[in-house]
Curated annotation (Swiss-Prot):
Residues 280-300, 315-366, 455-832 are annotated as: Disordered. Its main location: cytoplasm. GO terms for molecular function: phosphatidylinositol-3,5-bisphosphate binding; phosphatidylinositol-3-phosphate binding; phosphatidylinositol-4-phosphate binding; phosphatidylinositol-5-phosphate binding; SH2 domain binding. The PX domain is required for podosome localization because of its ability to bind phosphatidylinositol 3-phosphate (PtdIns(3)P) and phosphatidylinositol 3,4-bisphosphate (PtdIns(3,4)P2) and, to a lesser extent, phosphatidylinositol 4-phosphate (PtdIns(4)P), phosphatidylinositol 5-phosphate (PtdIns(5)P), and phosphatidylinositol 3,5-bisphosphate (PtdIns(3,5)P2). Binds to the third intramolecular SH3 domain. It is found in: Cytoplasm; Cell projection, Podosome. Residues 315-337, 486-499, 516-546, 569-584, 595-606, 615-625, 671-684 have a biased composition (Basic and acidic residues). Adapter protein involved in invadopodia and podosome formation and extracellular matrix degradation. Binds matrix metalloproteinases (ADAMs), NADPH oxidases (NOXs) and phosphoinositides. Acts as an organizer protein that allows NOX1- or NOX3-dependent reactive oxygen species (ROS) generation and ROS localization. Plays a role in mitotic clonal expansion during the immediate early stage of adipocyte differentiation. The modification Phosphotyrosine is found at Y25, Y661. This is SH3 and PX domain-containing protein 2B. Interacts with NOXO1. Interacts (via SH3 domains) with NOXA1; the interaction is direct. Interacts with ADAM15. Interacts with FASLG. Highly expressed in the stromal-vascular fraction of white adipose tissue with moderate expression in heart, skeletal muscle and the mature adipocyte fraction of white adipose tissue. Also expressed in brain, spleen, kidney and liver. Expressed in white and brown adipose tissues, eye, lung, heart, brain, spleen, stomach, liver and skeletal muscle (at protein level). Not expressed in kidney or bone marrow.
């Protein structure tokens, strides 16, 4: 006899709809045998369930019945969902889990994986070779066909009261949920199905979507005699006191567990489960899902089907498998100890005073998803209170600032970090580190808006330091489990007798004396359910309202929202940074990396490490060195360190000690006044936290030129008259690809920023036509006042770099960036400009490209020369510090030297 073949591989390929004998879905499975044969079989989910029960019966040890830790038999994805086999979504959802189950099954030891049950299951059957043909749609099935049970329309009910399950055979409900009714029972317990589970629920928690009540009255001649099997003390005026053994007449029945009875000439309501018909057994509380309504009971406690499968025939197994939890095995003793009183527990009464269907609740709001924050790129800080980190680290966000800087904590370190380097992920049970990919530009814009909205809603205890709100704690759901432990008449105090008390820990079960031990617990009244829920919801609303109303103010911005029209030339520019002015300034931070932090050049050149928001991505600009862009022409934001003034700075030289990088945001014209104002607002928050620029405009000059540098939203027009020149570099600046942080200034700037640090906003594209003048608002507050002096406006603070015989990388690309968005968002700019055109700007060899005109008079000092408005210069070198090496061509005696670039505009 040849050896029996074994299974080599099993692959679940897809699902397929079948209509014979009724509508259902089967799984298409490809089985490869050791003989080399490959066969296709079709199995519905219930067959897998049958196989699983056989496996658990045959291999109790491997099934984990005695020790769950020793279980090696895989779990099925879930129980059988009664009357759900015809729903495609249910079948598709289990496609992958079924495939994993089959693969795990055949990898078990041979005595399991090659046992008769497994081999027979995967053997080809006649119906696999000849699938049943579909019958005509109009043809009705014979009423005697026991398999024609699936094609039925299930009633749908809406949950009108929360319910927390008390037994494993029950399921919990939440207000607004829609359930399918599989079985209705006179006991008041209905077997229902949701998208995920099935079980028993009290009918009084449900209401038909059409408001129809399941109730029927009996004619006087049809009134039935029932015997009271448990004493009952009325808790409401319309209820009846019952004594054990009393015979009552049932006047009105319903399917909600409360019947109207007549006793001693009075009529009232009593729990149906406390009564039994004189001629038979007590009314069974719950019916099996396959039993007809109002028929005999079938105990469905939701225990493992394995417990009920022992010693039963397959037909019984098929009838009762629904509602079982396959993976949860309950010891036999636990089943035997289940008291009938729990299964006879009456449901809460429905409030008859509330019209049905009056206010069907809306579906509940889904719970908030807890989120975690991780760094998505490496960051090296250059500010005293910043924090450096690597990519992929979990951080705790302590404070979010609309300026684009967040105060975070990582283990024992904390400091300011750019929000664009941090992303949030949904918290999951698996602690696997997320795959960190930099968000796309359009995603960053959405993230910025989402973060701004989240910041407004954040609540938390009083924080240490300047406005340090903590994220809002997730809203906890109302504890519906305690709703049933109250007196069910709302605010009325009922007699708390031992026979009518409710225990919060056991749901409906009563605390009664030993003689009444088998008595079912008293049902809560329906009206009390509603009142109690309203009280709890109102209490919850009152608790949440102050929290919602006390959302923290956004961290302050340094700049005013709308700049003054004419800022004085001698405006103080070295005031210490105020702590609270930022709060006046609701800003939109969509500048990406341009917020004052240092990013290494190697990161800038890696697109996936640039979490930057820009309205139109320009890949060509990614190659431009971030440290080498000129301050006037730069149209792409700089991913550069947030510079601090050089220690060589002499406060006595000028009160306009400005940051050479922050200055760049002040010099570019904008296309329109409206956008310029918007840009000014949004970039005030992004300015440098330790340096800034303050200046005014010449009369007659218009605002709105700053947007011409795409993304630098703080920029000013070249027509704008700067109050003072930008600081020059203390030494020749290497415009190469390396970022050299500027030396830190005095100790006054070393202190921790009281507001989130800021970096220069992105530059904007230059506009050829000057509009009305828009003054640059003062950037620095009181911090600049401490060390200010009053020298001549426009006097340089730092020694300019020496002229170089070649065009460095810093000068190269400045004109290119004129029409490009750079690394930051492009507010305005010519979208149609191509990289070829930009490349022509890079090599500023022709005289036309290197000719600039002075837009204002400049008073020099011992290191610089003065010039008048209208002087024509040929730019020899553009330095990233904001100072250009130029030669005078007209309007003044010929000379060469360093001049501030914000006094120049390109000659038309």
């Amino acid at each position: 006899m040849p050896p029996r073949r074994s299974i080599v591989e099993v692959k679940v390929l897809d699902v397929q709809k079948r209509r014979v004998p009724n509508k259902h879905y089967v799984y298409i499975i490809r089985v490869t045998w050791s003989s080399g044969a490959t066969e296709a079989i079709y199995r519905r989910y219930s067959k897998f369930f049958d196989l699983q029960m056989q496996m658990l019966d045959k291999f109790p040890m491997e099934g984990g019945q005695k020790d769950p830790k020793q279980r090696i038999i895989p779990f099925l994805p879930g129980k059988i969902l009664f009357r759900r086999s015809h729903i495609r979504d249910v079948a598709v959802k289990r496609l992958i889990p079924i495939d994993e189950y089959c693969k795990a099954l055949i990898q078990l030891p041979p005595y399991i994986s090659q046992c008769d049950e497994v081999l027979q299951f995967f053997e080809t059957r006649p119906e696999d070779l000849n699938p049943p043909k579909e019958e005509h749609i109009g043809k009705k099935k014979s009423g005697n066909d026991p398999t024609s049970v699936d094609p039925m329309v299930l009633e749908q009910y809406v949950v009108v009261a929360d319910y927390q399950k008390q037994e494993s055979s029950e399921i919990s409900l939440s207000v607004g949920q829609v359930v399918d009714i599989i079985e209705k029972n006179e006991s008041g317990w209905w077997f229902v199905s949701t998208a995920e589970e099935q079980g028993w629920v009290p009918a009084t928690c449900l209401e038909g979507q059409d408001g129809v009540q399941d109730e029927f009255s009996l004619q006087p001649e049809e009134e039935e005699k029932y015997t009271v099997i448990y004493p009952y003390t009325a808790r409401d005026q319309d209820e009846m006191n019952l004594e054990r053994g009393a015979v009552v007449e049932v006047v009105q029945k319903n399917l909600e567990g409360w019947w109207k009875i007549r006793y001693q000439g009075k009529e009232g309501w009593a729990p149906a489960s406390y009564l039994k018909k004189n001629s038979g057994e007590p009314l069974p509380p719950k019916l099996g899902p396959s039993s007809p309504a109002h028929s005999g009971a079938l105990d469905l406690d939701g225990v493992s089907r394995h417990q009920n499968a022992m010693g039963r025939e397959k037909e019984l197994l098929n009838n009762q498998r629904d509602g079982r939890f396959e993976g949860r095995l309950v010891p036999d003793g636990d089943v035997k100890q289940r008291s009938p009183k729990m299964r006879q527990r009456p449901p809460p009464r429905r409030d008859m005073t509330i019209p049905r269907g009056l206010n069907l609740p809306k579906p509940p709001i889904p719970p908030q998803v807890e989120e975690e924050y991780y760094t998505i790129a490496e960051f090296q800080t250059t500010i005293p209170d910043g924090i450096s980190f690597q990519a992929g680290l979990k951080v705790e966000v302590i404070e979010k600032s609309l300026s684009g800087w967040w105060y975070i904590q990582m283990e024992d370190k904390e400091g300011w970090a750019p929000a664009t380097f941090i992303d949030k992920y949904k918290k999951t049970s698996s602690a696997s580190r997320p795959n960190f990919l930099a968000p796309l530009p359009h995603e960053m814009t959405q993230l910025r808006l989402g973060d701004a909205a989240a910041t407004e809603n954040n609540t938390g205890p009083e924080a240490v330091g300047p406005s340090r709100p903590l994220p809002e704690a997730p809203h906890g759901a109302v504890d519906s489990g305690m709703l049933w432990s109250k007196d069910w008449k709302g605010g009325k105090e009922a007699p708390r007798k031992a026979s009518s008390d409710l225990s919060a820990s056991t749901g409906y079960e009563e605390i009664s004396d030993p003689t009444q031990e088998e008595k079912p617990s008293l049902p809560p009244r329906k009206e009390s359910i509603i009142k109690s829920e309203e009280e709890l919801l109102e209490r919850e609303r009152q608790k949440m309202e102050p929290l919602r109303g006390s959302s923290p103010k956004p961290p302050g911005m340094i700049l005013p929202m709308i700049p003054a029209k004419h800022a004085p030339l001698a405006r103080d520019s070295r005031k210490p940074e105020p702590k609270l002015d930022k709060s006046k300034f609701p800003l939109r931070n969509d500048m990406g990396l341009e917020c004052g932090h240092k990013v290494l050049a190697k990161e800038v050149k890696k697109p996936n490490l640039r979490p930057i928001s820009r309205s139109k991505a320009e890949l060509s600009e990614e190659k431009v060195d971030p440290t080498s862009q000129n301050l006037f022409m730069k149209s792409r934001p700089q991913v550069r360190p947030k510079p601090t003034p050089s220690p060589k700075t002499e406060p006595a030289q000028s009160e306009d000690h400005v940051d050479i990088y922050n200055l760049r945001s002040k010099l570019r014209p904008a296309k329109s006044q409206e956008k310029a104002l918007l840009d000014g607002e949004s970039h005030h928050a992004a300015g440098s936290h330790d340096t800034a620029l303050s200046r005014s405009f010449l009369p007659g000059e218009g605002p709105g030129h700053g947007q011409d540098r795409s993304g630098r939203q703080d920029g000013l027009s070249p027509k704008e008259t700067p109050c003072r020149a930008p600081p020059r570099p203390a030494k020749t600046t290497d415009p190469g690809p390396k970022n050299v942080p500027v030396p830190v200034q005095e100790a006054t700037l070393q202190q921790r920023p009281v507001v989130p640090p800021r970096r220069p906003p992105p530059p904007k594209k230059t506009s050829s036509s000057p509009l009305s003048c828009r003054p640059l608002p003062e950037v620095r507050g009181a911090q600049r006042e401490e060390s200010r002096v009053a020298p001549a406006a426009g006097r340089a603070l730092l020694v300019p770099p020496k002229a170089k015989p070649f065009l460095s990388n810093s000068s190269v690309g400045q004109d290119d960036m004129r029409g490009k968005g750079g690394l930051g968002p492009r507010v305005t700019g010519k979208v149609g400009e191509t990289r070829e055109k930009a490349a022509s700007f890079l090599n500023a060899d022709g005289p036309k490209d290197s000719l600039y005109v002075a837009v204002a008079n400049f008073e020099g000092d011992e290191d610089t020369s003065s010039f008048q408005e209208g002087t024509v210069f040929e730019v020899r070198e553009k330095n990233s510090s904001g100072w250009w090496f130029c030669q005078v061509l007209s309007g003044a005696p010929s000379w060469e030297g360093w001049i501030p670039s914000n006094y120049l505009r390109k000659k038309p």
